[in-house]
Swiss-Prot record:
One of its GO terms (cellular component) is cytoplasm. PROSITE patterns: AA_TRANSFER_CLASS_3. SUPFAM superfamilies: PLP-dependent transferases. This is Glutamate-1-semialdehyde 2,1-aminomutase. The gene is hemL. Belongs to the class-III pyridoxal-phosphate-dependent aminotransferase family. HemL subfamily. Pathway: Porphyrin-containing compound metabolism; protoporphyrin-IX biosynthesis; 5-aminolevulinate from L-glutamyl-tRNA(Glu): step 2/2. PANTHER family: GLUTAMATE-1-SEMIALDEHYDE 2,1-AMINOMUTASE, GLUTAMATE-1-SEMIALDEHYDE 2,1-AMINOMUTASE 1, CHLOROPLASTIC-RELATED. It is found in: Cytoplasm.
Length: 426
């Protein structure tokens, strides 16, 4: 047995499923998950000494690559002064100044510890601000594991929420309405059925948890218009897209202004950080200035703030996003060409520094129903064969891939060459 296999066996006796987040268990692709010893630049190194070109990037935060010296040094320096104070610090102010400068729609920002905290707090704030209970989310979009967001859609354009995890009361989930991504008609139907009850829409501007689905041109502006028409707030969940699709996020890339924005992943540079913020009028409703309660023992802790500030300072440098987009385009184009050469039907979606691979005969993949029709079994074989080639992709057909500026053109070319060999075996 490999060291990863031994560790996985031991972990399963002590940790549910052997992992601390389900997708890491390789249940979407089968087999034994890799246990990682270290990472540097564009590469992961497992406990058995094998190296992999990494397109997971810790599920998004590592836009600069692993073990970036600016972030590492900032963490070491901050840790030398103490790990947590439970009191305000200067770095929290500097971080808030930087975030609100980079994302102009955020007049104010509150730091939390995860993307889940950010989305659940933003929804609570929207409900408190509007005095309404219902929310709209989209089929196939993931916004963390808060109870009101673990809801699936049934058939039809509009479905009253039903929980898709035990432990979520049906009475609570019923306030979540699920519509179809990229389908404005389904959203209007929800508002027309509940014109005075919907507090907010929460949406991924690029859906990254049904792989990678960009919005249709009219979709995000249409959501903004519907929120304005019916007096609801628009929450854009940029946990995945923030500072990755563009410096000011997908909202800037697509030209839509939300009332609230949720951030995570890149904002922490690899440390556990989330944030939510937006219009001053809305944020003023948050405790201690307003009645909507939110708190956190480790929120804004100095180590995480130092890492996040260092990361965003690097990400904001000229040319970073142009490089990131160009590398992602090279990979996407190369994979498509390799698939065509070997007769494999493939769609690759990409925006900024994220991408999605779909094995399908369809010409486009634009919503959850398109995604579930793709060939998941072929993806599983592709994943494991690419792993043998030294390329680490997301271990699920429903997760996006992530580029970093640490990836070289040689890394991209090696990945495309590996894919060409793998396609020939599928």
């Amino acid at each position: 047995m490999s060291k990863s296999e031994n560790l996985y066996h031991a972990a399963r006796e002590l940790i549910p499923g052997g992992v601390n987040s389900p997708v890491r268990a390789f249940t979407g692709v089968g087999g034994t998950p890799l246990f990682i010893e270290r990472a540097d630049g564009a590469y992961l190194y497992d406990v058995d000494g094998k190296a992999y070109i990494d397109y997971v990037g810790s599920w998004g935060p590592m836009v600069l690559g692993h073990n970036h010296p600016a972030i590492r040094n900032a963490v070491i320096e901050a840790a030398s002064r103490g790990l947590s104070f439970g009191a305000p610090t200067e770095m929290e102010v500097k971080m808030a100044e930087l975030v609100t400068e980079l994302v102009p729609t955020m007049d104010m920002v509150r730091m939390v510890n995860s993307g889940t905290e950010a989305t659940m707090s933003a929804i609570r704030l929207a409900r408190g601000f509007t005095g309404r209970d219902k929310i709209i989310k989209f089929e196939g979009c993931y916004h963390g594991h808060a109870d009101c967001l673990l809801v699936k859609a049934g058939s039809g354009a509009l479905t009253l929420g039903q929980p898709n995890s035990p432990g979520v009361p049906a009475d609570f989930a019923k306030h979540t309405l699920t519509c179809t991504y990229n389908d404005l008609a389904s959203v209007r139907a929800a508002f027309e059925q509940y014109p005075q009850d919907i507090a907010c829409i929460i949406v991924e501007p690029v859906a990254g948890n049904m792989n990678c689905i960009p919005p249709q041109p009219e979709f995000l502006p249409g959501l903004r218009a519907l929120c304005d028409e019916f007096g609801a707030l628009l929450i854009i969940d940029e946990v995945m897209t923030g500072f990755r699709v563009a410096l000011a996020g997908a909202q800037a890339y697509y030209g839509v202004e939300p009332d609230l924005t949720c951030l995570g992943k890149i904002i922490g540079g690899g440390m556990p950080v989330g944030a939510f913020g937006g219009r001053r009028e809305v944020m003023d409703a948050l405790a201690p200035t307003g009645p909507v309660y939110q708190a956190g023992t480790l929120s804004g802790n100095p180590i995480a703030m130092a890492a996040g500030f260092a990361c965003l300072s690097e990400v904001a440098q000229p040319g970073v996003h142009e490089t990131l987009t160009e590398l992602t385009n090279q990979l996407a184009d190369g994979l498509l060409n390799a698939a065509r050469e070997t007769g494999i039907p493939l769609v690759v979606n990409n925006v900024g520094g994220m991408f999605g691979i779909f094995f399908t005969d369809a010409e486009t993949v634009t919503c959850y129903q398109d995604v579930v029709k793709c060939d998941v079994e072929r993806f599983k074989r592709f994943f494991h064969l690419m792993l043998e080639e030294g390329v680490y992709l997301a271990p699920s057909a429903f997760e996006a891939g992530f580029m970093s500026i640490a990836h070289s053109e040689e890394d991209i070319n090696n990945t495309i060459d590996a894919a060409r060999r793998v396609f020939a075996k599928l």
